[in-house]
Swiss-Prot record:
<dbReference type="InterPro" id="IPR017221">
    <property type="entry name" value="DUF34/NIF3_bac"/>
</dbReference>
<dbReference type="GO" id="GO:0005737">
    <property type="term" value="C:cytoplasm"/>
</dbReference>
<feature type="binding site">
    <location>
        <position position="102"/>
    </location>
    <ligand>
        <name>a divalent metal cation 1</name>
    </ligand>
</feature>
<comment type="similarity">
    <text>Belongs to the GTP cyclohydrolase I type 2/NIF3 family.</text>
</comment>
<feature type="binding site">
    <location>
        <position position="329"/>
    </location>
    <ligand>
        <name>a divalent metal cation 2</name>
    </ligand>
</feature>
<dbReference type="Pfam" id="PF01784">
    <property type="entry name" value="DUF34_NIF3"/>
</dbReference>
<feature type="binding site">
    <location>
        <position position="65"/>
    </location>
    <ligand>
        <name>a divalent metal cation 2</name>
    </ligand>
</feature>
<dbReference type="InterPro" id="IPR036069">
    <property type="entry name" value="DUF34/NIF3_sf"/>
</dbReference>
<dbReference type="GO" id="GO:0046872">
    <property type="term" value="F:metal ion binding"/>
</dbReference>
<feature type="binding site">
    <location>
        <position position="329"/>
    </location>
    <ligand>
        <name>a divalent metal cation 1</name>
    </ligand>
</feature>
<comment type="subunit">
    <text>Homohexamer.</text>
</comment>
<keyword id="KW-0479">Metal-binding</keyword>
<dbReference type="InterPro" id="IPR015867">
    <property type="entry name" value="N-reg_PII/ATP_PRibTrfase_C"/>
</dbReference>
<protein>
    <recommendedName>
        <fullName>GTP cyclohydrolase 1 type 2 homolog</fullName>
    </recommendedName>
</protein>
<feature type="binding site">
    <location>
        <position position="326"/>
    </location>
    <ligand>
        <name>a divalent metal cation 2</name>
    </ligand>
</feature>
<dbReference type="InterPro" id="IPR002678">
    <property type="entry name" value="DUF34/NIF3"/>
</dbReference>
<feature type="binding site">
    <location>
        <position position="64"/>
    </location>
    <ligand>
        <name>a divalent metal cation 1</name>
    </ligand>
</feature>
Amino acid sequence: MKISELMEVLNNHVPFHQAESWDNVGLLIGNDKLDITGILTTLDCTDDVVNQAIELNTNTIIAHHPLIFKGVKRIVEDGYGSIIRKLIQNNINLIALHTNLDVNPKGVNRMLADQIGLENISMINTNSSYYYKVQTFIPKNYIEDFKDSLNELGLAKEGNYEYCFFESEGKGQFKPVGDASPYIGKLDSIEYVDEIKLEFMIKDNELEITKRAILDNHPYETPVFDFIKMNKESEYGLGIIGQLNQTMTLDEFSEYAKKQLNIPSVRYTGQHDSPIKKVAIIGGSGIGFEYKASQLGADVFVTGDIKHHDALDAKIQNVNLLDINHYSEYVMKEGLKELLEKWLFKYENQFPIYASEINTDPFKYK
């Protein structure tokens, strides 16, 4: 599998266009023509993480936080420059999945919510993208192979269902002329073929991969296919809100979250005996959504990087906050590894996928 193919799979499942405009996602360092020897997931790409990739003979790192984010003015043998140089010198590709993974329904916030054990979950702040209906015409005796090829690319899937197609039978006709090299039929002779009209749905970020799949796998030289924009929309968005299976006090919940997330410390605002049942969570830095979460009925808003004045404002307005530190997003390492194993199952014998064990938290706790 080449890096370019991996990028298509990632864009299919974690669309790059869903990242914030200020973000820097995608292939940041590398060559999309290289074959993959292994994948290492990490929260941050540090020198220790690069060394681990080298030891594992893994030439692809997928990080949540972009190594190249603010303007890089020089690449020298210290600071970020030394990491970038080491990546290039060792032919290691670096891919960033940042805010596009944050807003993904299966992304960082869902991983945190699952770790805490939230149920009946929904998104705090939703966006949407459009679906398209695809229709094309396939010779009847080729239809199953064609559907298999689409399924292998992750197309025609809806939630937990695969092979989501509609078929209708018909008869096609054509006459090969000139330099045609027909899969069926003879030159200068009208050919009638039993065909299947195949229809299925895709998301807007799957348009290009679907077009390529049809052109690469359809038996005809010039296949006919249509993309029809539908009213149906798919949702993605920032933050998760859900319920605990039992009510706790705020003090109990803070200890519970600390244990479930395996983090060294937490801090909270609010009365220690406040009842907590409904929980909203945004990993990383989610301040700015605490009041919307409260309006949605959340008893506590869980995030990281909470500043003094934001905490004071929330306390005055009786909005409970729980600060789980930015590094709590480390759960994405194992979470993304599991997602990649599902998305890349047909390549599972070609290369290994690892979740980095390197702790990249810059803080020490006492």
